[in-house]
Design a protein with these regions (language model features):
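A short, flexible loop at the N-terminus of ABC-type nucleotide-binding domains that lies
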Residues: 11-15, 24-37
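The feature captures the beta-strand-to-loop junction immediately N-terminal to the Walker
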Residues: 51-53
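Helix-to-loop junction immediately C-terminal to a conserved catalytic motif
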Residues: 66
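Short coil-to-helix segment of the ABC ATPase nucleotide-binding domain corresponding to the Q-loop/switch region
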Residues: 103-112
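Conserved ABC ATPase "signature" region
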Residues: 114, 121-141, 194
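Conserved ABC ATPase signature
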Residues: 146-150, 154
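A short, proline-enriched helix->beta-strand linker immediately N-terminal to the Walker B motif
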Residues: 165-169
Length: 276
């Protein structure tokens, strides 16, 4: 049996590099240190989950990788290029799907396709890209429906299609399934496993769900409580792919990984009120 191992981030292949990153925000009460001394390397094609209690800076770290905010100190690199702002090589999927309600699902995805590929491809090629992205998430049948005409799970799949349509090197997901019911969430998790296997995308995902993190991830990055949160541990998940949630339910390696994350969150980082 392969026991879960605590993994030294500095030994990873360096596709995404986070070097000594700190993030401080100015508030009405003064400076708030959100993150301190974040060091992490992520390999190409790796699925990494960021997990920790509310307020530990998970979304802040994801926004830094996305280039939506600039670090107070330190550097972030993707494919050896400094991250200085948003870019099509890093696509973001938020918990709120952020679809334009007056446009169809096809049109919402097509906007992203046109922005990235509009100057070098024909209209037919752009339409083909849009259709392929919707097909990838199983929504070809809903292409001409508007967001108000489809379910919450389908809306989130449109958001994923929009992100993947840009052929990003990195897919960044901020609690993408957090607002969905348990059955829909499980279905989309399984679909995401299949999509990532086919696209070989590098994924960084924020989650509060321990089982979701273990099921999907190659590495689980556990953040300490804020303020001044940092990386407490990085857990390497030794589960072979493809993964099946039913088979994993009684898998000893799965249970060991789950226990390791729960122990970190609720035994070693359990005093959230004192940290807030």
């Amino acid at each position: 049996m392969n026991h879960p191992t605590l993994h030294n981030p500095s030994l990873s292949t360096k596709f995404i590099q986070i070097q000594g990153v700190e993030q401080t925000f100015t508030t009405t009460k003064g400076l708030f240190p959100a993150l301190r001394d974040i060091n992490l390397n992520i390999a190409r094609g790796e699925f990494v989950s960021l997990i920790g209690h509310s307020g530990c800076g998970k979304s802040t770290l994801l926004n830094l990788i996305a280039g939506l905010t600039t670090p107070t100190a330190g550097n972030l690199l993707c494919a050896n290029k400094e991250i200085k702002g948003p870019g099509p090589e890093r696509a973001v999927v938020f918990q709120n799907h952020s679809l334009l309600p007056w446009l169809t699902c096809h049109a919402n995805v097509h906007l992203a396709v046109e922005r990235v590929f509009g100057k070098q491809e024909t209209k037919a090629q752009l339409q083909a890209r849009t259709a392929a992205a919707l097909e990838l998430v199983g929504l070809s049948h809903a292409a001409h429906k508007r967001p108000g005409e489809i379910s919450g799970g389908m809306k989130q799949r449109v958001g994923i299609a929009r992100a993947l349509s840009m052929e990003p090197q990195v897919l960044l997901m901020d609690e993408p399934f957090g607002a969905l019911d348990a059955l829909t969430r499980a279905k989309l998790q399984d679909e995401l496993l299949d999509i990532v296997a086919r696209t070989r995308s590098t994924v960084v995902m924020v989650t509060h769900d321990v089982d979701e993190a273990v099921l999907l991830s190659d590495q689980i990055v556990m953040l300490t409580n804020g303020p001044a949160a940092t990386i407490g541990e990085v857990l390497k998940v030794p589960l072979a792919r493809p993964r099946n949630r039913v088979a994993l339910a009684e898998d000893r390696d799965y249970q060991h990984c789950r226990k390791a994350v729960i122990d970190f969150l609720y035994t070693r980082q359990g005093h959230v009120e004192k940290a807030a």
